[in-house]
A protein has these predicted regions:
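Alpha-helical coupling/stalk and coiled-coil linker elements that connect catalytic or binding modules
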Residues: 1-62, 80-83, 100, 112-117, ...
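Short secondary-structure subsegments characteristic of cysteine-rich extracellular domains
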Residues: 84-100
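Extended, charge-enriched "interface" segments that sit outside catalytic cores
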Residues: 108
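Extended, well-ordered alpha-helical scaffold/bundle regions in very large, multi-domain proteins
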Residues: 121-124
């Protein structure tokens, strides 16, 4: 079937419609790349997969493949011993969550049914629940590591909270002093370069001994770290560095753990993308009440309007 015939049949329009039923970029790409095939055995195998997927949709309801995306770049980095970022690890978790959901779908039959052409795909999916749980235990968001990710991190952050309270108490005492307050643009505590500062009027700079870390665009306000809290700020800064080092260790440990399952993660992605592609065809058939045609060996095609 040449391109002229496909154009007459508005084949690309059909493919665009089909691709809307796929979730993952890979499955969408495969939908758009579909071309007619002539091998009868291959046709019948693909038709059987679509038929079995459609039967599962009728029996179990819709199946979502959200979260199915390639993590190949991250897996390649793991191969060379690199440490993944929190965002990369959460991305892998998103894929494993999809694997868990799709695996559960295959087990949601109310009655035992015979194996079909898709059983092998579902059987080979491994959600890696222990790995998923460990990553989610340690990483709350792309920019947030849980206090309990390690006992060391928990201890560091407890010290940070205590130091923060001491610094704020000292600076609040200064703000609450009527004389000191008269030298401030605002009675607030601000952060500059990771240091606690007070917004001091430029003309009153000499009245608040300390280190200038910044100034306003107009130059009327200087952000000064009072000498009274310099040592406390130094200790807090050291704790921040310790926190950063510990977070890097946590991510390194999680990366090493994830690297142990790289092959299975890659396999999960391949299977999920394939199932996404198959179920997209089934969902499309369901929407338009499609039926499987009967094929012949003569290459004869009869299209009914």
């Amino acid at each position: 079937m040449n391109e002229k015939v496909l154009k007459t049949l508005e084949y690309n329009k059909i493919l665009n419609q089909l691709s809307e039923y796929a979730c993952s970029p890979e499955a969408k790409k495969r939908c758009l790349a579909l071309r007619p095939i002539t091998d009868k055995a291959q046709i019948e195998q693909l038709q059987l997969q679509t038929k079995d997927a459609l039967s599962r949709l009728f029996r179990c309801g819709n199946l979502s493949f959200s979260g199915v995306h390639s993590v190949n770049d991250s897996l390649k980095r793991l191969e060379i011993g690199a440490s993944l970022s929190a965002a990369e690890l959460l991305s892998i978790c998103s894929l494993l969550e999809a694997a868990k959901r799709v695996k559960a779908f295959s087990r949601s039959e109310k009655e035992e049914v015979p194996d079909d052409s898709l059983t092998g795909f579902f059987t080979e999916i491994e959600p890696l629940t222990p790995l998923y749980d460990e990553i989610k235990r340690c990483i709350l968001a792309e920019d947030e590591i849980a206090d309990d990710a390690s006992s060391t991190l928990r201890s560091i952050r407890r010290s940070m909270r205590g130091m923060n309270d001491r610094i704020r108490a000292q600076m609040n005492n200064m703000i609450n002093n009527s004389t000191t307050r008269s030298y401030l643009q605002d009675a607030v505590i601000t952060m500059r370069d990771g240091r606690y500062c007070l917004p001091v009027k430029a003309e009153a700079k000499s009245q608040i001994p300390g280190m200038v870390h910044d100034q306003s665009s107009s130059g009327s306000t200087l952000f000064i770290e009072p000498m009274a809290v310099v040592n406390l700020n130094n200790e807090y800064k050291e704790l921040l560095l310790k926190e950063k080092d510990e977070i890097e260790k946590i991510l390194e440990n999680l990366s090493r753990l994830t690297a142990n399952f790289s092959e299975q993660i890659a396999a999960d992605y391949t299977i999920l993308a394939e199932l996404d592609f198959i179920f997209a065809k089934a969902a499309y058939a369901q929407t338009y009440n499609g039926v499987a045609p009967t094929f012949n060996n003569e290459g004869y095609l009869h299209i009914k309007k």
